[in-house]
């Protein structure tokens, strides 16, 4: 009977089980008192609690189903937003027609085809007293110069080198301009923005109008930027409005020997058999602003661009957008430098705000270490 009771899980087994449980509890206590183990466990818990995807995985199936329904709504919102931007593009086209007469008059003043009236040229500066003082000093200098040399004051036609000065003032553009580009850009008379016609795919064209010159025969050079305003089927939640997706340039009809986008190099070749040497000339690409009109093409055949090409294309898109949104509408302010000062002040404000926010975050970490604003 005793043997049967032991084999059936009698008192001896109970004692052994109790002993094992006690040992396990002691081992657990020892492990939980180890700082390294506790730190590792805490880090793991923190990572789980602060990762949104990990949190979503813990939710019941019914809740996940409702979240999927919210995503469906979000996609529909993205399509409505795309429609909104299409109508904004239509409004831009409408108001571009209202701006154009003013821009045409701007061109006439710049080129000197029309002289502004006294009423049109009247301007009251915010620093009127300083301007008056500067004007008085200037008048004294002019009078002194006239008395000394009796030279008639020059009165150039229009506003010389208006657009070229803008290129020099704006860093984004001046970085593209080489010394041999400068004489050509001095012939630039106007830059216009044209929007795509109603019902056509969204796009805009930059038109660079040149006076007759010794470099090329084109009166106008164009750059077309193609846009897309619809959510990506593969990633609809990334939609943030219209984006430039491709661009086309134009062919520049260079006059003989005037093409600044290529340079000619001479190379000597030696004949293997006869040992005679001949000199050959070869044209190779040359850095120039006018390469702007021969852009890279965005890959549309499934092949991806290399990193350098992607960067070049993105920079091109940024420049085109800057011409459209900033340079053309506010040209005179980039000529005088006032718009550049505004841009610089805005950038400094953003940096200061970022530094201040970083300081606030550090303070929050000290006061409440459990708070994570990203959760």
Swiss-Prot record:
Residues 1-28, 339-375 are annotated as: Disordered. One of its GO terms (molecular function) is nucleosome binding. A motif (Nuclear localization signal) lies at residues 265-271. InterPro entries: NAP-like_sf (IPR037231), NAP_family (IPR002164). The modification N-acetylalanine is found at residue 2. It is found in: Nucleus; Cytoplasm. Polyglutamylated and polyglycylated. These 2 modifications occur exclusively on glutamate residues and result in either polyglutamate or polyglycine chains on the gamma-carboxyl group. Both modifications can coexist on the same protein on adjacent residues, and lowering polyglycylation levels increases polyglutamylation, and reciprocally. Polyglutamylated by TTLL4. Phosphorylated at the G0/G1 boundary but it is not phosphorylated in S-phase. Phosphorylated protein remains in the cytoplasm in a complex with histones during the G0/G1 transition, whereas dephosphorylation triggers its transport into the nucleus at the G1/S-boundary. Pfam families: NAP. The keyword RNA-binding does not apply. The modification Phosphothreonine is found at residues 51, 58. GO terms for biological process: nucleosome assembly. The modification N6-acetyllysine is found at residues 105, 146. The modification Phosphoserine is found at residues 5, 7, 49, 53-54, 125, 304. It comes from the Eukaryota. The keyword Nucleus applies. GO terms for cellular component: cytoplasm; nucleus. Keywords: Acetylation, Chaperone, Cytoplasm, Nucleus, Phosphoprotein. PANTHER family: TESTIS-SPECIFIC Y-ENCODED PROTEIN (PTHR11875). Acts as a histone chaperone in nucleosome assembly. In condensing spermatids, mediates the loading of the heterodimer composed of histones H2AB1 and H2BC1/TH2B onto the nucleosomes, thereby promoting the replacement of histones to protamine in male germ cells. Belongs to the nucleosome assembly protein (NAP) family. Interacts with core (H2A, H2B, H3, H4) and linker (H1) histones. This is Nucleosome assembly protein 1-like 4. The gene is Nap1l4.
